[in-house]
């Protein structure tokens, strides 16, 4: 099968070439209090 990965390439991969990135939370879920406030404001 030609679609199998080249294990030699994986074994010789240098992790030092990877760049270190800082991950940031982008879409945080709202708290229960925030959801309740929004529900109350929609009703009134």
Swiss-Prot record:
The modification N-acetylalanine is found at residue 2. One of its GO terms (biological process) is actin filament organization. Its main location: cytoplasm. The keyword Phosphoprotein applies. GO terms for molecular function: actin monomer binding. Plays an important role in the organization of the cytoskeleton. Binds to and sequesters actin monomers (G actin) and therefore inhibits actin polymerization. This is Thymosin beta-10.
């Amino acid at each position: 099968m030609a679609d199998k990965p080249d294990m030699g390439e994986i074994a010789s991969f240098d992790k030092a070439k990877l760049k270190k990135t800082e991950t940031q939370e982008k879409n945080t879920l709202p708290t229960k209090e925030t959801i309740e406030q929004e529900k109350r404001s929609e009703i009134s």
